[in-house]
Each structure stands twice: as structure tokens, then as C-alpha cells.
Amino acid sequence: MNPFERSGDLMRRSLGRELMDDPDLEEDCHLSALRGLRRINTVSLTTRQLLRKLLEWGDPDARVRILDLACGGGDVLVSLERALSRRGFEVAAHGCDISPLALEAARENARKAGSGADFSQLDVVNGEIPSGHDFILSSLFLHHLSDEDVVSLLGRIADSADQG
């Protein structure tokens, strides 16, 4: 079902559970869903858009610390880390996800890409957001949350970010 079918409003999030939200989802289905998200990120030029913003903000002589919340297979974080490294940035990239299988896929993705990104398990809705990052992102995740959870998470992200 199209999540916007009834409302016709592209600004309204669909809070319905997705296949990937099932903790009992079979491994091959979960990996297939992660590959699908990677395709979405590729087609929508997610890394390119984030990179453009980081290049506006960042100083190539400075260290950039990036945190990707609900990182899934880590494709956005790894691509961003590699693109910044190629441009001379020193990058510390860290991704968090609640799913051990997604984290395993993210680590493998980083290894294959020659990325120094690291990953850890975290329930970003209920857990403590790691501090000490300059740039915090979350791609294709917030639509899962209620308005109240989004506001709470964004506030906790702002509190954890190094601002300067």
C-alpha cells in the first residue's frame, strides 16, 4: 500500500510498521531490505547532498566527526567518509543501529570500501545519543517515529552535538 494513498499529502509521514521493523524478520529478507535502502540512497543522491553541506561547513584542515543514527547497512556513512577522505579531510565516522544484522552488514560494507567507519548497537529512540560529533545525520528513519518521538530525538541530538 502506498503510504500517501489516502491522504495524498507528501508531507505526512506513514507510521505503519515496515517489514524491517519485525525483530523476527528472516536474515535474507532483512539483507534484501538493506540493499533496497542502499538503492534508494544511491538514486536520491543522499551522499552527494550531505557532502555538499559538509563542504560548505567544513575546513579540510580540521577533523570532522560524523555520527549516523539508525545507519542501517552504513552505506551513507561509508560513502560520506570515503568522499571526505578523498578531499583531504580527517574523518571519524561512527554509525549506530538497533539491529545486529544491519551492523554486521555495515561493518562489511565499510571493510569492502576501505573505510575507517565504526559501528555500535543503539536504540536511538530510548538510548543516550553519543556526544562529541560535529555532524549528526539520520537517513530514512524519522518517518518511523511519532511527532513526539521526533521532537524528543531532535532535542537530544542537538544536546549531544558539538556546536561551534
Regions found by a protein language model. Give the residues of each.
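N-terminal auxiliary segments of SAM/dcSAM-dependent transferases
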Residues: 1-23
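Short helix-loop-beta connector
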Residues: 58-65
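Class I SAM-dependent methyltransferase SAM/SAH-binding core
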Residues: 67, 73-76, 80-126
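Hydrophobic adenine-recognition pocket in adenosine-nucleotide-binding enzymes
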Residues: 141
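A short, conserved alpha-helix within the catalytic core of class I
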Residues: 145-156
